[in-house]
């Protein structure tokens, strides 16, 4: 809310940076809570519902901020989103059950580093961190540059129409929960590979010059991403040997590192080689992800 009131550009940037720092810890804490409070058989479905909720939030945030910006400018958009955040905080405090399995530990740099080393020595966790890097990197890369592709020839779509493509996030809301329920029946490895397979099919369709095929490809790609992400993030809580919050934090570090590194590389490929080579790079990433899923 303070961002709406300040008049200094530098102060606004500082407040947004603080907001980013605060937000970055929330997914790790949420994943750790789910991992600690649900038993292993029900954990994949619970994590799938959580990931589906993040997809819904991402969609509503984009649509609502755009609507409020058109009505009253960026101040109304920021204020409206902040107001909804306060409402969500109140509901969170009121409805969230107290943790039953959390064990407090003294804050110690030596203990923190020891826990990080423990997680990084775990081959299954390393495999999951790699999945986070590859999957999120590819997801961000496609959605970062598909707009440039569709704005240019032969499509020439407007920014408004391109923005509506984020409606495909609805597919992720359902696929995340669906994937979590499939894990007990088919196993995490197979469900994860199925999600990555959908991403590969989506990339192949996005390489087309036919708009309908690209829209279908984006839908399948989003289905696959949220399914695979739900499975991988749920497995972190299962395979972490204690200190689940730090294991989740490492997963998310890999997740966002992938978005930064692959997003940058994808931009270079797009600028210097074009769309089809970019699709080939993304396909290669997902082939690696499917191959490395054998470690689960």
Give the location of each predicted region.
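Helix-to-loop junctions at the C-terminal end of transmembrane segments
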Residues: 174-187, 270
């Amino acid at each position: 809310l303070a961002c709406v009131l300040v008049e200094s550009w530098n102060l606004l940037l500082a407040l947004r940076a603080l907001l980013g720092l605060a937000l970055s810890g929330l997914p790790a804490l949420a994943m750790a809570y789910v991992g600690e409070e649900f038993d292993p058989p029900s954990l994949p479905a619970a994590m799938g519902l959580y990931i589906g909720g993040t997809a819904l939030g991402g969609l509503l945030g984009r649509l609502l901020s755009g609507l409020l910006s058109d009505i009253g400018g960026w101040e109304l958009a920021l204020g409206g989103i902040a107001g909804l955040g306060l409402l969500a905080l109140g509901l969170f405090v009121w409805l969230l059950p107290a943790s039953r399995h959390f064990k407090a530990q003294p804050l110690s740099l030596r203990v923190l580093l020891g826990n990080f080393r423990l997680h990084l020595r775990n081959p299954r966790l390393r495999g999951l961190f790699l999945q986070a890097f590859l999957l999120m990197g590819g997801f961000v890369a496609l959605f970062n540059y598909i707009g440039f592709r569709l704005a240019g020839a032969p499509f020439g779509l407007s920014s408004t129409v391109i923005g509506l493509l984020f409606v495909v996030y609805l597919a992720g809301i359902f696929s995340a929960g669906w994937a979590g329920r499939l894990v007990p029946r088919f196993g995490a490895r197979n469900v994860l590979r199925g999600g990555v397979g959908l991403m590969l099919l989506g990339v192949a369709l996005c390489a087309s010059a036919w708009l309908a095929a690209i829209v279908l490809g984006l839908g399948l790609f989003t289905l696959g991403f949220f399914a695979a992400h739900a499975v991988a993030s749920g497995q972190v809580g299962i395979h972490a040997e204690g200190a689940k919050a730090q294991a989740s934090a490492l997963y998310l570090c890999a997740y966002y590192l992938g978005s930064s590194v692959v997003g940058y590389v994808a931009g270079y490929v797009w600028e210097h080689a074009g769309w089809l080579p970019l699709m080939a790079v993304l396909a290669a990433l997902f082939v690696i992800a499917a191959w490395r899923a054998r470690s689960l």
